[in-house]
Amino acid sequence: MTQAGTRSTNGDTENTDILAQARQQVLERGEGLSRDQVLQMLWLPDDRLEELLALAHDVRMRWCGPEVEIEGIISLKTGGCPEDCHFCSQSGLFMSPVRSAWLDIRSLVEAAKQTAKSGATEFCIVAAVRGPDERLMSQVAAGIEAIRNEVEINIACSLGMLTVEQVEQLSGIGVHRYNHNLETARSFFTNVVTTHTWEERWQTLSMVRDAGMEVCCGGILGMGETVEQRAEFALELAELGPDEVPLNFLNPRPGTPFGALEVMPPSEALKSVAAFRLALPRTILRFAGGREITLGDLGAKQGMLGGINAVIVGNYLTTLGRPAEADLRLLDDLQMPIKALNASL
């Protein structure tokens, strides 16, 4: 499903006024857009896209600065997940080619080393689980200790839903940031996942924040949600107030319920990037999975000039990403400095 709802028909003058109002509100005062204002941005005609992206870039530069945060991710435990997230090839409930596997500690350390060599300040350890059991928590603790002995990098984790005790344990071993995506608007969530609730995810995020870890929470666009629901999602994230929002775009995976969905049109994806920046002016907004197939090289450049200030380099969990060298070359071409580790501690 692409753009839906009743669009404004008053022409370029109204669109210009909308952008002028957004410039005053977000750029000058640092106040994020409301749901209805985000919706207006998503409804802008394509001939206003360049102006929208320019405004989002100005907002990013004003409230976040020119630096770009680089992150690498690694799957500690792949596949065999009991949850039914309809976009995910790691679910054990679907006829996916992905099979369950564990990464050994030595390989985890080597991956962290390679990530650090790319200039990254963040290394995220991910596991395909509903939530971690004792074995996984022990493996994560051992992996983090091994990485810290050899690599200077911030460590993040994404291990599903947590208990209070697990949150405290991760905080205690020095996890810098915890990722748990809400994935989509609350009103659309049951179309994406049925084995747990949106509220359960929110609860984990609240506990993470209370424990003093940074919160990383975003989602996937292009899963059949309406444009109204994209605006709803942006404001739900603004209410949560995460330190980082990773924006993924659906890359339909064979064997999953969403495997036959169409890829999101590039103009919609770029409008979404800009609109989310205007809703979240001070948040780290990260290009994540699906940008390669959705936007290509040109769209990646437009996104970096349209509100994005962080990227995941290298491959994702079960799909190929852009080579790290390509992203680093793009940042160099755009004269965007990479955030240094000592600036992020």
UniProtKB/Swiss-Prot annotation:
Keyword Iron in record: yes
Enzymatic class: transferase
GO biological process: biotin biosynthetic process
Cofactor(s) listed in the protein's UniProt record: [4Fe-4S] cluster; [2Fe-2S] cluster
Pathway connected to this protein: Cofactor biosynthesis; biotin biosynthesis; biotin from 7,8-diaminononanoate: step 2/2
One GO MF term attached to the UniProt entry: 4 iron, 4 sulfur cluster binding
Family: Belongs to the radical SAM superfamily. Biotin synthase family.
Protein name (record): Biotin synthase
Source organism per UniProt: Mycobacterium leprae (strain TN)
Gene from which this protein is expressed: bioB
